[in-house]
């Protein structure tokens, strides 16, 4: 429900405000609590007199916000002094040049009701033993003066957000008021608008071990929303814990095309967008030209290393185009760049994957879609355990590849690197 003029009283937005960003703090335990008493629904009360920190969900929300903020031109942070707001700003870590604490960004004071439960009327109007809505609104209006500097970030509370929106004449919905959402308030010819900016969604295949697991962990740690595909959902739960608002699991079998469509469909159903695809699942079985050729194994290798990435690329392409800066990362190999042995199956299919990457780049470029081959030499995983050319400690580590994948997701369209050759020993690259 929008705030009324009666709620605002004499409070008015200051002159000279420029476009700015806003985050409501991440969730706390009180945000999660509701009860019903005598048929009336009551909500947890946390105002300026309740100084509690974020719960695990709130910390995740702050991480997601940080992913968004690091790509924005934040000129400075102005934060409420309450712990939940400070923790949100700290975890989000927008990396801007200045940080201020503003008492006027505190939540409304709910007096003796703090830490308990209250009816809707307590939040919508003046209420016994609570701070006057007009006085609260005047404080918020004063805090808005910080936005006279363009692109400042305000980190505060739900009540503050509702007053800000009312002062600027902007309608907001539950989508805007959710904990941890990054909002951009912008003005054109004295008309204000607000939009939600959320962190990118990346799909990653083959994530239960090795390179794929390191990629998924790195993306999660840096505030991406991820959709993870593996043959067994329980393996995903064992590796990453239960699903949450930023983490989606789906069955993915590189030999089962229907599982790929289902995975994309459920990702869209949960997140309503796809910004990146990492084709990591691969097959390194040995098909040796100097030995008898196992045609069935060669076909399996072709299907996993080339056909599955092709189908996933085709399924995701409409959503990647819609994002305007879609990213496809194909986990290739130095074996897709040169030939150093007789393992014809792996060499052929990785060269084929390079062809897919280049074709994807050609098709997607004008739509903002960028594709990259990451081509490592020996990586310290089970797939490289057969070699005695180099020890595991000297090999590329999965975490090294994960950083390159994230870098590919974050590079601008105007300066994209289409191939990363990654070496751990002296060898030919052609």
Swiss-Prot record:
Pathway: Opine metabolism; mannopine biosynthesis. One of its GO terms (biological process) is lipid metabolic process. Pfam families: adh_short, His_Phos_1. One of its GO terms (molecular function) is oxidoreductase activity. SMART domains: PGAM (SM00855). Gene3D superfamilies: NAD(P)-binding Rossmann-like Domain, Phosphoglycerate mutase-like. Disulfide bonds: none annotated. Substrate binds at residue 333. Keywords: Oxidoreductase, Plasmid. CDD domains: HetN_like_SDR_c, HP_PGM_like. It comes from the Bacteria. InterPro entries: His_Pase_superF_clade-1, His_PPase_superfam, Mas1, NAD(P)-bd_dom_sf, Sc_DH/Rdtase_CS, SDR, SDR_fam. The active site is at residue 346. Its EC number is 1.-.-.-. NAD(+) binds at residues 203-227. Reduces deoxy-fructosyl-glutamine to mannopine. Belongs to the short-chain dehydrogenases/reductases (SDR) family. This is Agropine synthesis reductase. It comes from Agrobacterium tumefaciens (strain 15955). The gene is mas1.
């Amino acid at each position: 429900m929008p705030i009324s003029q009666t709620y605002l009283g004499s409070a008015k937005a200051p002159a000279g405000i420029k476009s700015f960003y806003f985050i409501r703090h991440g969730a706390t335990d009180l945000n999660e609590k509701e009860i019903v008493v005598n048929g009336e629904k009551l909500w947890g009360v946390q105002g300026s007199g309740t100084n509690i920190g974020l719960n695990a969900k709130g910390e995740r929300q702050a991480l997601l916000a940080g992913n968004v903020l690091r790509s924005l031109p934040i000129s400075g942070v102005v934060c409420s002094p309450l712990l939940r707001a400070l923790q949100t700003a700290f975890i989000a870590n927008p990396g801007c040049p200045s940080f201020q604490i503003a008492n006027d960004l505190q939540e409304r004071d709910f007096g003796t009701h703090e830490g308990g439960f209250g009816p809707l009327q307590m939040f919508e109007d003046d209420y016994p033993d609570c701070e006057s809505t007009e006085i609260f609104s005047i404080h918020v209006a004063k805090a808005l003066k910080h936005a006279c500097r363009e692109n400042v970030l305000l980190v505060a509370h739900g009540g503050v957000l509702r007053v800000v929106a009312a002062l600027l004449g902007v309608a907001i919905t539950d989508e805007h008021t959710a904990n941890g959402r990054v909002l951009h308030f912008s003005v054109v010819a004295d008309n204000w608008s607000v939009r939600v900016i959320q962190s990118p969604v990346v799909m990653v295949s083959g994530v239960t071990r090795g390179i794929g697991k390191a990629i998924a962990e790195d993306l999660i740690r840096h505030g991406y929303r991820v959709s993870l595909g593996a043959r067994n959902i329980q393996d995903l739960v064992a590796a990453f814990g239960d699903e949450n608002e930023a983490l989606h699991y789906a069955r993915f079998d590189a030999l089962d095309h229907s599982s790929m469509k289902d995975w994309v469909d459920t990702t869209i159903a949960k997140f309503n967008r796809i910004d990146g695809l990492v084709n990591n699942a691969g097959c390194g079985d040995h098909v040796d030209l100097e030995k008898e050729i196992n045609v069935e194994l060669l076909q399996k290798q072709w299907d996993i290393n080339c056909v599955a990435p092709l189908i996933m690329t085709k399924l995701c392409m409409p959503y990647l185009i819609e994002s305007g800066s879609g990213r496809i990362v194909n986990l290739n190999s130095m074996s897709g760049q040169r030939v150093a042995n007789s393992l014809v199956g792996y060499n052929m299919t990785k060269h084929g994957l390079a062809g897919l990457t280049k074709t994807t780049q050609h098709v997607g470029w004008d739509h903002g879609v960028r594709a990259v081959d990451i081509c490592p030499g020996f990586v310290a995983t089970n797939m490289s355990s057969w070699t005695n050319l180099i020890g595991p400690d000297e090999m590329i580590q999965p975490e090294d590849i994960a950083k390159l994948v994230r870098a590919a997701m974050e590079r601008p369209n105007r300066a994209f690197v289409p191939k990363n050759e990654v070496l751990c020993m002296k060898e030919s690259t052609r």
